[in-house]
A protein has these predicted regions:
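C-terminal and late-domain segments of enzyme folds
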Residues: 54, 112, 245-247, 259-269, ...
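Residues that mark the start of a beta-strand
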Residues: 3, 36-37, 248-250, 276, ...
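Internal gly/pro-rich beta-alpha loop/helix module
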Residues: 129-243
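Cysteine-nucleophile active-site neighborhood
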Residues: 277, 301-381
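Beta-strand->loop->alpha-helix junctions that form or flank phosphate-binding loops
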Residues: 42-43, 177-185, 276-283
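ATP-dependent carboxylate-amine ligase catalytic core
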Residues: 2-115, 119, 123-150, 159-163
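A short helix->loop->beta-strand "cap" motif at the edges of active sites that frequently abuts
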Residues: 117, 175, 323-327
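Phosphate-binding active sites in nucleotide-utilizing proteins
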Residues: 247-312, 316-323
Length: 472
């Protein structure tokens, strides 16, 4: 088996592109390499990078997040998803030692220590020669318990630049150079598309990934990478997670170019709780599939205003269903879609209109980072399947705000950290809809899939329907 963590000296060093390229090169069976099973992971709460890594590796990418999970849960997640893979590739976030606190307790280095992983350091070498040596030596000396097993030099200015860097690193350090990736206008163009193009546009995504994989395979010593990351320590898979034996409930899930932000383990947790997920397309389908509940996750609805607005039949059907009492949950982009309208770059587009407020896009993030929420007595899932719901840890990342809500709007959460809708509240409640800017994650501290599925079941019973009317 082979396991390694890809990190960098600072953010925006190109580690995502390198990670995607390595996942593709090692799993594709091309570039002089046999096809291997590569299990990708991503540190932190990000949605976009894992989507690309999933396509590149051909296996779902799973997030590992210190803020949302205790150490024991991270170890279990890593073992559960990585035990049957030949290669476990973990992409870090930000710099190797960057974190939320002074001790770096949630840094990439902390994850490498926890999971006993060698680190491959991606270095943006633009404008550097001899200074690369103290940069590497400083990273080694800062924490001797971290094994920097190799470096990949990125954005080089030509073969002469590469030769100088290799000579300096060989002379002053004991760290091998695993690869040297030249500055490449075409690769830079692909990198810019990564955050803009919906990865679930499969054909286009695979074309970009193939281009990245070919370039990385040609400039990184894949055999040396596998050599320094080899381990004989097997991962013991944890016990199988319990599954519901109740009759399944059908939950319609929006998944298309506009909406695609779902954690792989959240979808699995919905299934384990007894949900049958039925996917639909907000851009092309004219009505919801038959369902007992509705889920609309995050995405980029602002990039598809014309198509979403033009699909009047589906918008009307979604509104009828929610106003008729269909249990529904929406996050971020889903909340935007369910509002009256979205305003962006001088353009205004009508949306579903079940939330009596409007969305305005901004140039800078309105809410960005980790969130702590406290559910209140209005929360429709509070107590679903348990005696109560403690404070929830989650995250948000939105460039929009929801405004012109009625003064008597009911909310599900008090915001203890973060922004939410107005800095104080999140989780708009309408009928049996809960719509928030916050992205929840299924963890030991937030079992939202089981609670939502139980809520859907409760809504299907006559007693529940009689005691909890569909109030606006």
């Amino acid at each position: 088996m082979h396991r390694f963590l890809i990190s960098a000296a600072h953010k925006s060093s190109g580690k995502t592109t390198l990670s995607i390229g390595l996942a593709a090169a090692l799993s594709s069976g091309k570039h002089g390499q046999p096809a291997r099973t590569v299990q990708p992971f991503k540190k932190g709460p990000d949605y976009i990078d894992p989507l690309w890594l999933s396509v590149a590796a051909g296996r779902p990418c799973y997030n590992l997040d210190f803020f949302l999970s205790p150490d024991s849960e991270l170890q279990a997640q890593f073992a559960r998803h990585g035990h049957d893979a030949e290669i476990c590739l973990i992409e870090g976030n930000k710099g190797l030692y960057d974190g939320l606190d002074l001790d770096g307790s949630n840094s990439n280095a902390a994850l490498a220590r926890l999971l006993d992983l060698p680190v491959v350091l991606v270095l943006d070498a633009r404008g550097m020669t001899r200074g690369i040596a103290p940069l590497i030596l400083g990273h080694q000396a800062f924490d001797r318990n971290i094994r920097i097993a190799g470096v990949i030099l990125n954005r080089l200015g030509g073969r002469r630049h590469e030769a100088k860097l290799r000579a300096v690193i060989e002379h002053y350090t004991d760290v091998p150079v695993l690869g040297a990736v030249q500055e490449d206008p075409e690769l830079a163009l692909v990198e810019r598309h990564l955050g803009l193009m919906p990865v679930n546009e499969t054909a286009e995504a695979e074309r970009h990934i193939a281009a990245i994989g070919a370039r990385i395979a040609a400039q990184v010593d894949l055999n040396r990478l596998l050599e320094i990351s080899r381990t004989d320590a097997a991962l013991a898979p944890p016990a199988a997670q319990p599954r519901s034996h109740e009759k399944p409930v059908r939950i319609a899930v929006a998944r298309d170019a506009a909406f695609g932000f779902y954690y792989a383990d959240d979808l699995a947790a919905l299934t384990a709780a007894g949900a049958q997920t039925v996917f639909f397309d907000t851009l092309h389908d004219t009505k919801l599939p038959p369902c007992d509940g509705l889920l609309i996750g995050g995405g980029f609805p602002e990039c598809f205003l014309d198509q979403l607005e033009a699909n009047t039949a589906l918008r009307a059907d979604v509104r009828r269903a929610i106003e008729g009492g269909l249990p529904a949950y929406a996050e971020c982009g889903g909340l935007m879609y369910l509002a009256r309208s979205i305003h962006w770059k001088g353009r205004s587009a009508e949306m579903v209109g079940v939330i009596p407020g409007d969305i305005r896009m901004h140039d800078k993030p309105v809410g960005r980072g980790y969130v702590i929420l406290e559910p209140n007595a209005n929360h429709p899932w509070r107590g679903a399947g348990s005696d109560g719901t403690p404070s929830l840890r989650a995250h948000e990342f939105h460039y929009s705000n929801l405004y012109d809500l009625p003064a008597d709007t009911r909310y599900a959460y008090a915001v203890k950290r973060g922004h939410g809708i107005d800095g104080h509240h999140d989780g708009v409640l309408r009928h049996r809809l809960l719509a928030s800017y916050t992205h929840l994650r299924a963890t030991s501290g937030c079992d939202w899939p089981a609670k939502f599925v139980q809520h859907v079941r409760d809504c299907m019973t006559n007693d529940y329907k009689e005691t909890t009317p569909c109030s606006p």
